[in-house]
Amino acid sequence: MVHFVGAGPGAPDLITRRGAALLADADCIIYAGSLVNPALLGLAKPGCAIYNSAEMTLEQVLDTIRAAEKAGGTTVRLHTGDPCLYGAIREQMDALDADGISYDDTPGVSSFCGAAAALCAEYTLPNVSQTVIITRMEGRTPVPEAEQLAKLAAHGATMVIFLSIGLVDKVRQALLESGGYRPDTPAAVVYKATWPEQKVVRCTVSTLAAETRRNGITKTALIVVGDFLGENYERSKLYDPAFTTEFRQGTEAGQ
């Protein structure tokens, strides 16, 4: 049996209870060593075989899983954040399907949630943004034409940009290209969200590249953009005295 497990954004106590239990029971752990906090490996039982997938190809990962299966062991494939975002899990699952190896998936706290926590911010504010775009800048891995960053920026919605801090000049240019964001639209760079060395750099779209360089951030960071980082928003209807819900009768006058 193979368990795909989300390790969470960084802090070891942010893994789910289920994920921690699966780690503690595993006979084999294959973890994404470039981003997963190694402190989580302290949950492994004595004798557990541990492999760093940052040093492996897909074929080597699969061969390691097959060997563990042949020995009757349980494998945890430990991915950073939540495996569903940029986790490259589909190709692994398809190979396991072809081999007849059973697997399941345990979600984790994504780094985009960790970034919001670091900012003490809410991505979806009434009359500001009700949409969150999660994307990346095109690099060695292409993106579909319709999902080019400049085209997505035209929406002006809250945007969280993964895997792109090394292309921050191109990111800045793309964000301004369509006019969806103003030069003074608030932005932030969150380095290693929830880790002890977490760093938050607040800026604007215009100053994004310069502030990133000034703070020496070159990797392991998210870029967040949008007016949700500003001061203006409307009160939520959910807790408005005049708003009737399944659990509470509202008043017309709001008194």
Per-region residue spans from a language model:
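Short secondary-structure boundary/capping segments
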Residues: 20, 42, 67, 124-125, ...
